[in-house]
């Protein structure tokens, strides 16, 4: 079946006169990519031409060609077959004409069929950080009979934190690229966009609290444009409901007798919110949903959390009773406002850690309290278990006691930009899940990363698992990933590099948010050099002791990439992968050198200390140089993009978020310090390195005087001025324009790794 020959068209894409927007979008996407592959301009038409191959896109209800094929028993396609968002790619002969059918049980399925043809048959590689388009002036298809149906009916991607950690300065093209990628990865639920900002003002005006708000702008905001585009792509968007916090003082003057709770998040300033047992709380939710539905419609999914990550300071003697008040009041309000409402409570609120009076976050839950809370919700619900791959709350709550739920992979927290994640472990965990009878009510897979555009190898795996985990094996995934990303020949050559990574940083001893094995320069150095959860300290020590074995494997991975000069010259994604792997190789060596310096200090070995200290500072310089050569890893570039949000304050605001998470100068909380740590050239050069250098100088002075102890107060006095100075100083532009591949070759040629 010929689609193109020598760069000229031999086919036409046929849609019905009543084709939906999404079906026409599928046709437009297909003709765009076929042109990129072959150079041919393939027309999209409602009237099949007399000659050439026909590509029929849609369903029987919208495309007469497909209806004829079904009526004459050439094809089976309906809402129930393949079913869900399933699709088929089928070559048939209809009335003597060669016809390729791309159809779905839903409109989304039809779009997935078009992308599957491109990716699975024609060799296009779709990735978050780029695409690989093969060159084929002649496109000849074999006989095709492909049918796919998702295992999980719902597939969500997105987390509210990524708006802060990744998307704060995105423009329309950035957002469109992100949601097009989600469509290619068959996502059908996304995290809410920021479109409800004017609703509270309108409600409080109706309640007589505030004057009438100004009319909304005539032009839609960026998030409103993205919202509309996302809906066109067939993705559902939940509505985030207010908790009754952030009310103006005028509200409390108008309703002086309303019940409130005094809350606190981390160590920041306490705030008030409506008590869920107060009648105004239910009224607020009903009115909010009414306004939201009038403006945006509804997908009937509602996110509502009580005190997620916050503590109740005043207003409730029994926290569990307030939680139950919240469950009951929210249920009643949603049933009144939207009879088809589905509540999606998040397990993130269910902190099942051992109770700790010093916990700066919410009061902890027991599994019995979780059950009582879920049972108090009196409308349909689906628990979003946001951290299934590590926290395993679904196991501790006996699969949420029979309630519908979704398996969520969080993986990358705000600091999740380094290479990490247990690839084989995730595959095995999901396979155990789908073979467990108790998990029968899990029909949702969530990918809940806080930061995107890092660890693509891990998140592409999540996308495959979310569609259908049954055929996914590590070997099959690795081969597919490399072939699509680099091409068949180069991909096969690079598989050994990724095996090195999966045996190390993407293996069972990879770091997590609990067992932190991040680059040690990201934190204030001390004499412990352990930054994970205290209960995991012994395991962290054991893992650090085995970390030297990672270094030669990472070096080998770098060398394998360097053995592909033609690919590195033509494939930007391969260059980016080389930068990331080389960066990790440097980070691992730094962490080991810092541990050696600390050990030498404690052992009063001045010579060994100086040797390790020199390695630490040299590696940070090498890291800075490499990062500066890759534009997305430059701090000055990030600051420049943030100017549209912060104007002349962009440098301070951007740096402040990396130190304290928040933008505001007066909002500092010790548990949040360095949470948004990452590798940007200016962060390493002007924040992390000065802090490491000060640490080494302090230990050097102590060593000279025979001391082996440093108090927390001494460290704080040392680091606070560095942090404050970094935030206050204008962003510095480091040298740019170097070839990252040449830098990595130079670093490899410099000699063996210093890990002893």
Model-derived segments and their meaning:
Residues 1-150:
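Contiguous, structured surface segment used for ligand recognition
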Residues 18-21, 61-65, 164-165, 310-312, ...:
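Short acidic, S/G/P-rich loop/turn micro-motifs used as interaction or catalytic elements
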Residues 19-27, 107, 168-175, 216-223, ...:
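Solvent-exposed, acidic/flexible segments
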Residues 42-43, 51, 131-139, 161-162, ...:
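Catalytic-core regions of glycoside hydrolase
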Residues 144-166, 263-270:
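N-terminal small/glycine-rich loop or linker at the start of catalytic domains
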Residues 571-624, 692, 696-725:
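Ordered core of a single globular domain
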Residues 684-756:
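Extended, compositionally biased alpha-helical segments that mediate assembly or anchoring
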């Amino acid at each position: 079946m010929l689609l193109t020959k020598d760069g000229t068209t031999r086919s036409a894409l046929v849609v019905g006169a009543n084709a939906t927007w999404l079906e026409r979008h599928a046709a437009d996407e297909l003709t765009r990519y076929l042109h990129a592959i072959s150079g041919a301009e393939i027309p999209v038409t409602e009237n099949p031409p007399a000659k050439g191959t026909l590509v029929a896109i849609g369903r029987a209800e919208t495309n007469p060609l497909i209806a004829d094929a079904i009526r004459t028993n050439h094809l089976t396609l309906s809402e129930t077959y393949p079913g869900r968002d399933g699709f088929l790619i089928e070559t048939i002969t209809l009335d003597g004409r060669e016809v390729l059918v791309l159809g779905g049980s839903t409109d989304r399925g039809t779009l997935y069929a078009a992308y599957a043809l491109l990716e699975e048959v024609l060799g296009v590689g779709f990735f978050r950080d780029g695409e690989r388009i093969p060159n084929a002036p002649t496109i000849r298809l074999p006989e095709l009979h492909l049918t796919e149906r998702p295992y999980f009916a719902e597939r969500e991607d997105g987390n509210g934190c990524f708006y802060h950690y990744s998307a704060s300065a995105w423009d329309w093209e950035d957002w469109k690229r992100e949601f097009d990628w989600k469509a290619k990865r068959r996502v059908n639920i996304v995290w809410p966009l920021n479109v409800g900002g004017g609703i509270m003002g309108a409600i409080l005006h109706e309640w007589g609290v505030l004057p009438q708000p100004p009319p909304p702008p005539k032009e839609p905001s960026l998030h409103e444009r993205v919202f509309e585009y996302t809906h066109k792509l067939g993705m559902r968007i939940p509505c985030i409901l207010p908790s009754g916090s952030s009310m103006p003082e005028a509200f409390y003057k108008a309703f002086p007798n309303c019940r409130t709770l005094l809350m606190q998040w981390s160590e920041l300033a306490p705030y008030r919110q409506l008590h869920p047992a107060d009648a105004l709380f239910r009224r607020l939710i009903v009115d909010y949903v009414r306004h939201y539905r009038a403006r945006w419609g509804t997908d009937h999914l509602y996110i509502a959390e009580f005190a997620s990550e916050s503590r109740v300071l005043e207003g409730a003697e029994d926290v569990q009773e307030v939680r139950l008040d919240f469950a009951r009041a929210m249920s009643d309000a949603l049933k009144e406002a939207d009879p088809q409402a589905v509540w999606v409570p998040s397990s993130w609120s269910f902190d099942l850690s051992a109770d700790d009076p010093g916990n700066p976050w919410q009061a902890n839950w027991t599994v019995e309290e979780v059950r009582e809370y879920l049972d108090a919700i009196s409308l349909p619900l689906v628990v979003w278990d946001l951290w299934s791959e590590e926290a395993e709350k679904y196991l501790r709550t006996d699969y949420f006691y029979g309630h519908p739920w979704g398996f969520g992979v969080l993986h990358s927290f705000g600091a999740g930009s380094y290479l990490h994640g247990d690839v084989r472990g995730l595959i095995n965990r999901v396979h155990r899940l789908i073979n467990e009878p108790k998990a029968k009510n899990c029909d949702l897979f969530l990918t809940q990363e806080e930061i995107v555009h890092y660890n693509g190898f891990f998140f592409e795996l999540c996308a495959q698992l979310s569609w259908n985990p049954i055929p996914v094996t590590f070997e099959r995934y690795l081969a597919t990933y490399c072939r699509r990303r680099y091409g068949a020949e180069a991909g096969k050559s690079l598989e050994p590099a990724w095996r090195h990574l999966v045996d190390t940083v993407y293996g069972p001893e990879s770091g997590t948010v609990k067992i932190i094995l991040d680059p040690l320069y990201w934190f204030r150095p001390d004499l412990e050099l352990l930054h994970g959860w205290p209960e995991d300290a012994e395991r962290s020590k054991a893992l650090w002791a085995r970390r030297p074995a990672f270094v030669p494997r990472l070096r080998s991975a770098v060398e394998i990439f360097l053995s592909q000069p033609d690919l590195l010259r033509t494939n930007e994604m391969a260059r980016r992968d080389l930068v990331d792997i080389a960066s990790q190789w440097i980070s691992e060596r730094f962490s080991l050198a810092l541990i050696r310096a600390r050990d030498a200090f404690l052992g009063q070995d001045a010579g060994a200390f100086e040797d390790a200290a020199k390695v630490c500072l040299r590696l940070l310089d090498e890291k800075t140089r490499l990062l500066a050569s890759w534009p997305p890893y430059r701090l000055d570039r990030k600051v420049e993009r943030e100017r549209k949000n912060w104007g002349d304050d962009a440098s301070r605001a951007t740096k402040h978020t990396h130190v304290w998470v928040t933008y505001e100068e007066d909002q500092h909380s010790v548990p949040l310090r360095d949470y948004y740590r990452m590798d940007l050239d200016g962060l390493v050069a002007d924040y992390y390195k000065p802090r490491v250098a000060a640490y080494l100088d302090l230990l050097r002075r102590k060593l000279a005087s025979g001391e082996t102890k440093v108090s927390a107060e001494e460290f704080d006095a040392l680091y606070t001025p560095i942090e404050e100075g970094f935030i206050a100083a204008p962003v510095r532009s480091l040298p740019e324009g170097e070839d990252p591949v040449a830098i990595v070759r130079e670093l490899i040629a410099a000699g063996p790794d210093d890990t002893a």
